[in-house]
Amino acid sequence: KEERASWNFLDYNSGAFLQTWGAYHGAEKGRSSYYYIGATAEYTYERKQHRLFAIGGYNQELTNNGDWDQWAMSSFFAKANYTYDRRYLIEGTIRRDGSSRFGNGNKFGVFPSVAAGWNIHEEAFMKPLKGKVNEFKLRASYGSLGNENIGLYKYQTLIDGTNGNETVFGNPDITWETVHMFNIGTDIRLFRNFAVTFEYYNKKTTDMIITPPISYIGGINSAPINSGTVRNKGWELDLNYGKQVTKDFGFNIHGGLSQNKNKIEELFGAPYDEGNRINQIGYALKSYYVYPTNGLLQESDFSKNEAGEWIPKEGIVIFDGQQPGDIHYIDRDGDGKITTDDREIRGSEQPNLNYFANVSLNYKKWSLDVLFQGVTGVDAYYSEPFSFGLNTSGDGSTPLKAQLDYWTPENTNARYPRLAPNSSYGNNYHTSDFWHFDASFCRVKSIQLGYTFDQLGLKKIGITNIYVYLNAQNPFTFAKEKLTDPENRGQRGSYPLVRTY
């Protein structure tokens, strides 16, 4: 058990020359408790070419975080691995976890896993290549994990303490979310200096803990449920090559590529419409849900009535008040008006490819380290201030140089719609493919140049060496779009990435 208590009780000040004084006093006490009990048992057996290791255990914990809330976990686990002649490896694990976050009959989940490996470089047929192939290992695994990361007491229906009304509906059937993952990979080292690691994985999350949208007729927040399946597939490649070429010069190059794609396979009550995002079966989580467009409306799309008002021609569908220079939205469902039903799924935030590279050079007492990082194939959409007209009133934004490329009768191929004092003009602020941009980028994350002083004079005064360096963080970014940082894609109200030197 662990208890903590603290008091803040006195603070005072006085002004000696004015013969006045003031005092503040108060008291504050906090209490938390944590109970833990655990035990493990191990067994190791080795004989000739055989090696067996096994471990089993149990642990239980109870936590109180300073109020009436309490939660507890208990776990049983066992693991064993066997190695034969340093060539063949197999390992199995099983655990049974229980959580107080779930109701009776649903507290416990069982999560097994198994893994196997083959050190091919230890085989007799690899001996002729021993000097060239230092390591060659194949490995594969399959296992499951549980997720109980939800709020407390979600399995219970709660009532208002004053009038007895039910205020929160619980779900007594809520239980563990389970992740099933298969992966296969290889580790290779050639000529002692070149290392390659490749891994492919297929991860399936079932019984997802989700909260459905609020019912239109219920009038109360929905209870969490187990419903939904999401699959993540991807691969990772890691390369490393380093060598001390001469006594004075050495280098190391480390790089990697990775790709992950997720897709919703099952979802209760789908789709979940979240405005400009949507969760729909067959698409990535939180895919963009935007209005399709066809450039900007032109004067040729309208005629004028006797009052001088712009009237759209037959086949041209607009929002009320739109005129030449505004975004031309497409009536996708053909009902003769632009509504939220015209939106469609257009991409997601998950990149097509992630990559990085780290280059280190050493020459005598000099050292240089450069780190690159980037992504390709990322969908993003501009929002305020870029899609909100000038919007210079109140806490609006300063006009941008890029907004000079706005629509006029003489500049019909402009990047921006017609000038407008705020977002209410022309309905141009809706998230649409007109505001789409490719957020691919390559960034130099850091550059560091250093020099080591280690002359004998320093050692006489007890100093082994002095390392002096110049460092720059985020000095360069290469991207197609320049209006916003392509990595965090923050626009109004977000703090930009900082360059430091």
Question: Which residues fall in each region the model found?
Answer:
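Extracytoplasmic gating/loop element in the C-terminal half of outer-membrane beta-barrel translocons
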Residues: 375-467
